Amino acid sequence: MELILLEKVANLGNLGDKVKVKAGYGRNFLLPFGKATVANAANLAAFEERRAELEKAAADKKASAESRAAQLAELEVTITATAGDEGKLFGSIGTHDIADALTASGVEVAKAEVRLPNGTIRQVGEYDVAVHLHSDVEATVRVVVVAA
């Protein structure tokens, strides 16, 4: 199935690329989420007319992500949680908790943007957490977990 990408898609291509993908990936993900359109003559012509508009929208998204990354780079978030004597938390700190703490400190962050590659945080301490704001923009935030 040949498609024209309407936005940058990770591990596939950039805006305007003509790509060949499996039918299921195209029908079940790219087309329903508006990330691509079928590559036929009519859609190619329509895309070329809208190309400047789509590129401007993509540039605006990236610029806003970069400004949020600059704000996040300056932040250090403290999260309090109940913990035992040895610093082991009763429960854990996950992406949702970190996203809520960042949003409360003034920078809007979605749960899906927070990356914890080693799983949830289960110990008291300081952690560097990656926040994936855009396919090209990633910020690191210092998260301090203290016992309540």
From Swiss-Prot:
GO terms for molecular function: rRNA binding; structural constituent of ribosome. This is Large ribosomal subunit protein bL9. Binds to the 23S rRNA. Belongs to the bacterial ribosomal protein bL9 family. InterPro entries: Ribosomal_bL9 (IPR000244), Ribosomal_bL9/RNase_H1_N (IPR009027), Ribosomal_bL9_bac/chp (IPR020594), Ribosomal_bL9_C (IPR020069), Ribosomal_bL9_C_sf (IPR036791), Ribosomal_bL9_N (IPR020070), Ribosomal_bL9_N_sf (IPR036935). It comes from the Bacteria. Keywords: Ribonucleoprotein, Ribosomal protein, RNA-binding, rRNA-binding. The gene is rplI. GO terms for biological process: translation. It holds the Pfam family Ribosomal_L9_N. GO terms for cellular component: ribonucleoprotein complex; ribosome. It comes from Pseudomonas putida (strain ATCC 47054 / DSM 6125 / CFBP 8728 / NCIMB 11950 / KT2440).
